[in-house]
């Protein structure tokens, strides 16, 4: 989970209010101290923390809750509102207004820029845009091959020449190449060789003058914490069309420091990197981000994930008719497991459900994820005939499947038991209920 330790600490602070018999000044000050401690441990600038928590304390002690809202609920709302304001208030998505829209990506060495270029290309492809990627990184020979490796499976073309040493020439030729192909979006990757902002900004200006991008995006490594302030500020002052993506928020305790430092400059954060996979990039919406961070859920984010699934996995009405008649196969179950896998880590999904927040222990979640992985491996060891007609799977087949998948007979039996329960469940529903369920879960 992105900023897991910070989220747990903030969520625990709010629980003190929720569980208290009554709320007095001493409790408010105690909770404010907990919030201060959590933010400082996440490498948020101390001056910013004190300013934020002073306002939370003032409002919590002075404001009267509106009619119908308890004092506890009002204080939780105040914490939510002030943290949201702290991180930028509103979402500012990248807009594809012109065809083609050109995005220029820059970032210092090790920021995760090239991987982020691939993630961004995939993000827009999933939303129906035709995307082309230009690799103008002439400094690192592996950059072109890295982009090809990441994007070839999704049939996203990468333009580049590992032997060319002129970055500006490559960028210009790449943009012209994709303009001729009529793509909707061109993403230009640049060299990440600079360790200092001023060198980076100089190269950005030179390439910008040649390709005239609609937006320049700085990729910042979330593990650098509050040091991100200097990078973001220099960048914001250098270009009026700049925005920021903060990466590696899944792997650092300093991510909160990086996010708050960037937000303090006023530079808009457009996306955050939430993992290593190509789909682990999400639009940054401060309100939804804070809601998840505090354990309050993110229903809108969950619904968007389901909507994405509708394009990936689609069961026809004929399929649903089959399910109602009890003709639900292991192949259908496999498609569902694959759909769940595409939604992202189970922990990430559960954090979006209001009320669950951080209440489920990590070990429980990891057992659930391991079980799903195991089921998929077991089904990969089955024949097409077994997947389509599970009734033929007798004990000798179970032993063969267990051997082939490196699992136990007990594991295979557990999968078959789960399958039979799902089959029974579908058979017990009427068509209207099943259609509603199908729409909800991307079937």
Curated annotation (Swiss-Prot):
Record InterPro entries? AAA+_ATPase, P-loop_NTPase, Signal_recog_part_SRP54_M_sf, Signal_recog_particl_SRP54_hlx, Signal_recog_particle_SRP54_M, SRP/SRP_N, SRP54, SRP54_GTPase_dom
Record field: catalytic activity: GTP + H2O = GDP + phosphate + H(+)
Please list the GO terms describing molecular function.
7S RNA binding; ATP hydrolysis activity; GTP binding; GTPase activity
The Gene Ontology biological process annotation of the record reads: SRP-dependent cotranslational protein targeting to membrane
Q: What does this protein do?
A: Involved in targeting and insertion of nascent membrane proteins into the cytoplasmic membrane. Binds to the hydrophobic signal sequence of the ribosome-nascent chain (RNC) as it emerges from the ribosomes. The SRP-RNC complex is then targeted to the cytoplasmic membrane where it interacts with the SRP receptor FtsY.
Summary of subunit composition and partner proteins: Part of the signal recognition particle protein translocation system, which is composed of SRP and FtsY. Archaeal SRP consists of a 7S RNA molecule of 300 nucleotides and two protein subunits: SRP54 and SRP19.
Family membership noted in the UniProt record? Belongs to the GTP-binding SRP family. SRP54 subfamily.
**This protein is called what?**
Signal recognition particle 54 kDa protein
Q: What is the lineage of its organism?
A: Archaea, Methanobacteriati, Methanobacteriota, Thermococci, Thermococcales
Name of encoding gene: srp54
